[in-house]
Amino acid sequence: MEDNNKTQAYDSSSIKILEGLEAVRKRPGMYIGSTGEEGLHHMIWEIIDNSIDEAMGGFASTVKLTLKDNFVTIVEDDGRGIPVDIHPKTNRSTVETVFTVLHAGGKFDNDSYKVSGGLHGVGASVVNALSSSFKVWVAREHQQYFLAFHNGGEVIGDLVNEGKCDKEHGTKVEFVPDFTVMEKSDYKQTVIASRLQQLAFLNKGIQIDFVDERRQNPQSFSWKYDGGLVQYIHHLNNEKEPLFEDIIFGEKTDTVKSVSRDESYTIKVEVAFQYNKTYNQSIFSFCNNINTTEGGTHVEGFRNALVKIINRFAVENKFLKETDEKITRDDICEGLTAIISIKHPNPQYEGQTKKKLGNTEVRPLVNSIVSEIFERFMLENPQEANAIIRKTLLAQEARRRSQEARELTRRKSPFDSGSLPGKLADCTTRDPSISELYIVEGDSAGGTAKTGRDRYFQAILPLRGKILNVEKSHFEQIFNNVEISALVMAVGCGIKPDFELEKLRYNKIIIMTDADVDGAHIRTLLLTFFFRFMYPLVEQGNIYIAQPPLYKVSYSNKDLYMQTDVQLEEWKQQHPNLKYNLQRYKGLGEMDAIQLWETTMDPKVRTLLKVTVEDASIADKAFSLLMGDEVPPRREFIEQNARNVKNIDI
């Protein structure tokens, strides 16, 4: 950020206190989202965000995360260092205040930070409250200070000056989550690395280091992107064939007046985008490094600018007449990869989760900046401008044909309970909150599943063969595909751009395929379809993967089912002298209806894997790589991950 962010002295008076910390351990989910895996990672993000805030303010250049055995988590930066003097309100050291009082932090004082990105603004004190051990070292003017806490924020002694140190300034935090409050689950290296890399892209010039010492051979990662969003777009489009090589980029910092308040804000806008030859849109937006997955006013301003400029150039260059139907926002987004990142001192979000930006003053600002850079690009690059217009016109024509096909289908069979696909064996209940749809590979297994199910709440939809690979297909092909049409009709929500979540007919949509390569391919094809065309179902956790057994072990008139080779080997080691018969299931069709119910469909005993997406941009890149046209990066990915192919996270 600019030098004018380096404002007044950073001392105890900069730390503003809003409320106490008592409720955190009683209701941790209110503060970090959950006590499970997501909440565990959220604790890391809260401490990382404090360091990134320092960097965004221009006070730090390096942030480092280290993971050690036994969940020891260390975050350090070379920022100013937390003030060490006595806080005027608490009469305790400011370091102790920051880590024991909820909402105490420099981010609430506009003179200390111009922008801030803490996920819920609750700060490091919540992490302290949820930690069994919490230590902090502060360097100020080559003096090192130390303070320790335990048992969820109980301070151990006073802040201690440990004397001179090599480091001029900075902060180091070490914590261990308290598993009497948090659920014990591993940190995911892939999730952490992806988020840290994303932060490096969004904050150009900042170095972020990650050291994972939990294994016998420690792994180290380091990211620094002087190109910022331009390098981010290149990274996202690496598996896609670009329409042209140029990445369009612009940035601007401007002071604008708030529409709803009598005050002005200095807002920084960065935008980068590039068209590719796919049919999917990949628009990712951020405010203060927070991924606004539902968009908001910054995305609206971006899209409005593109629509305006493309339509004007289309008319001026005789692609369209003034009286022709104009190119729409859906048309201009086909094959577009874009990043919109803003830094705002007072962001307003719709809802508590910060998924949609609501500041109305942002829309015209982004519109103005994007219009300026995009118009200049179109004027200076007529060949690329024509390629963009032709692509959007092809998208417009495909949209028209798709609309005609949809209308024809609706006239033939308006979607109601009487027009469900013929192969669907629906459930009896009409209560979506308890009903389940099993998508089953093949008519044979579908027949077994129909017999074995609980027909009151379980519906079965058999699919014949592999569905269309939507990553390589145009919307019109997708809509006319028989298997996909049956799936869309059964689910009931439609597909984008006409997706309506409130029409969902089943709370759980369960993919049940064979445990072989073909089954895995069908699962991937279905997941690609859900991600690209029914993303809200993935986002809110409606998609599941069934886990049918791989083995049946029979001994002493007992049958035992196992889902993995690991389970089988562990059982063998525990029963070395037991005589048994072993059956390996090659497919669902080898089980009878009772076995399928008892192992895979009975809610009391079955195992379901919920499909979740930690970060849409990471998943977008994974699907493009695995299901797109580019062979070399897919081969490289498979070679690198061949040994872990059963555990690929997207």
Curated annotation (Swiss-Prot):
Cofactors (names): Mg(2+); Mn(2+); Ca(2+)
Family: Belongs to the type II topoisomerase GyrB family.
Organism encoding this protein: Mycoplasma pneumoniae (strain ATCC 29342 / M129 / Subtype 1)
Oligomer and partners: Heterotetramer, composed of two GyrA and two GyrB chains. In the heterotetramer, GyrA contains the active site tyrosine that forms a transient covalent intermediate with DNA, while GyrB binds cofactors and catalyzes ATP hydrolysis.
Residues the entry annotates as binding Mg(2+) 2: D514, D516
Single annotated GO MF: metal ion binding
Location in or out of the cell: Cytoplasm
Gene name tied to this protein: gyrB
Keyword Lyase included in the entry's annotation: no
Cellular component GO terms, alphabetical: chromosome; cytoplasm
Reaction catalysed by this enzyme: ATP-dependent breakage, passage and rejoining of double-stranded DNA
Feature type site, description Interaction with DNA: K466, N469
Region (Disordered): 400-422
EC number: 5.6.2.2
Protein name: DNA gyrase subunit B
Miscellaneous comment as given in the Swiss-Prot or TrEMBL entry: Few gyrases are as efficient as E.coli at forming negative supercoils. Not all organisms have 2 type II topoisomerases; in organisms with a single type II topoisomerase this enzyme also has to decatenate newly replicated chromosomes.
Record's cofactor remark: Binds two Mg(2+) per subunit. The magnesium ions form salt bridges with both the protein and the DNA. Can also accept other divalent metal cations, such as Mn(2+) or Ca(2+).
Domain Toprim per the UniProt entry, residue ranges: 435-549
Biased composition (Basic and acidic residues): 400-414
Function of the molecule: A type II topoisomerase that negatively supercoils closed circular double-stranded (ds) DNA in an ATP-dependent manner to modulate DNA topology and maintain chromosomes in an underwound state. Negative supercoiling favors strand separation, and DNA replication, transcription, recombination and repair, all of which involve strand separation. Also able to catalyze the interconversion of other topological isomers of dsDNA rings, including catenanes and knotted rings. Type II topoisomerases break and join 2 DNA strands simultaneously in an ATP-dependent manner.
Keywords noted in UniProt: ATP-binding, Cytoplasm, DNA-binding, Isomerase, Magnesium, Metal-binding, Nucleotide-binding, Topoisomerase
Positions annotated to bind Mg(2+) 1: E441, D514
The keyword Repeat belongs to this UniProt entry's keyword annotation: no
CDD domains on file: HATPase_GyrB-like, TopoII_Trans_DNA_gyrase, TOPRIM_TopoIIA_GyrB
